[in-house]
């Protein structure tokens, strides 16, 4: 039953963005340590970890964002805001597979991503680069308990 929920396609992703999951210790993906090590050694792929702790997985990462605990939702909003501001969203996909996107987009128009990232105790330029990589390359997302244990866990999920 453990593997019946969505899993990132670690084998076929160029960028794996992880929020609050230490895959080297918490094996909720079959063969997680082996897959994470292989991904981290591949020069054409990126492992990005968002976690306040320098976990075993964060030590493997190409980029580790040591976020201030409890600010994950704020970081995600900043990232969405940057994607929309820079035009990195997949417009064709959104047109073909969504409805009402303009009403969602309007929620981010006046959002101050720089101030949000500062509240997260992260470097704006580094977050902008992580966001660009995630938005413009073949990417997957993995999140786990670390994301769900904060003050805004319902919003995060």
Name each region found by the language model:
Residues 1-157:
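Cofactor-pocket helix-loop regions in the catalytic cores of large enzyme subunits
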């Amino acid at each position: 039953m453990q593997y019946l929920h969505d899993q990132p396609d670690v084998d076929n992703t160029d960028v794996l963005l992880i929020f609050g999951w230490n895959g080297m210790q918490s094996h909720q993906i079959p063969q997680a340590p082996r897959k994470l090590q292989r991904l981290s050694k591949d020069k054409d792929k990126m492992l990005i970890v968002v976690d306040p702790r320098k976990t075993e997985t964060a030590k493997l990462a190409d980029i580790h964002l040591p976020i201030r605990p409890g600010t994950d939702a704020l970081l995600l909003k900043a990232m969405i805001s940057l994607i929309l501001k820079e035009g990195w969203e997949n417009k064709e996909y959104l047109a073909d597979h969504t409805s009402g996107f303009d009403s969602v987009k309007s929620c981010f128009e006046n959002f101050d991503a720089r101030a949000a990232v500062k509240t997260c105790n992260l470097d704006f330029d580094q977050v902008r680069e992580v966001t660009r990589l995630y938005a413009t390359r073949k990417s997957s997302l993995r999140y786990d308990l670390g994301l769900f244990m904060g003050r805004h866990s319902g919003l995060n999920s």
